[in-house]
């Protein structure tokens, strides 16, 4: 079995739009490294972040290594190591995670596999 990909649909919780974007200005190399280290430890990786408008929604393509269950992935996205936490925000996003059916796209993911 190989890694799997997810598309994550993010929407802002009430009152979080301005706080999110203000804090993104402070998302420096140190915070990025912490977030990437947490991803590595959890066996997940965000390939791309795609905001559609300042007010949202935002979409991301994530990869989870073999052995990471769907619920473990959702728990990471919603949990204490989510990006918003490292921006000094308390869980600013609602996150709908949808696994991509690799069989429908020829067995490969939308990006070259990291795992």
List where the protein language model places each region.
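Short S/T/G/P-rich N-terminal loop/turn motif that feeds into the first structured element of a domain
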Residues: 1-57, 63-75, 93-115
């Amino acid at each position: 079995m190989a890694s799997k990909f997810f598309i994550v649909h993010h929407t802002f919780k009430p009152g979080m739009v301005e706080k999110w974007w203000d804090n993104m200005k402070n998302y420096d190399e140190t915070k990025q490294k912490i977030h990437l280290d947490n991803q590595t430890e959890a066996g997940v990786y965000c390939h791309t972040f795609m905001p559609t408008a300042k007010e949202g929604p935002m979409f991301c393509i994530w990869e989870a290594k073999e052995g990471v269950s769907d619920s473990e992935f959702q728990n990471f996205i919603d949990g204490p190591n989510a990006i918003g936490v490292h921006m000094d925000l308390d869980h600013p996003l609602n996150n709908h995670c949808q696994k991509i059916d690799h069989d429908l796209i020829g067995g490969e993911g939308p990006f070259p596999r990291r795992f």
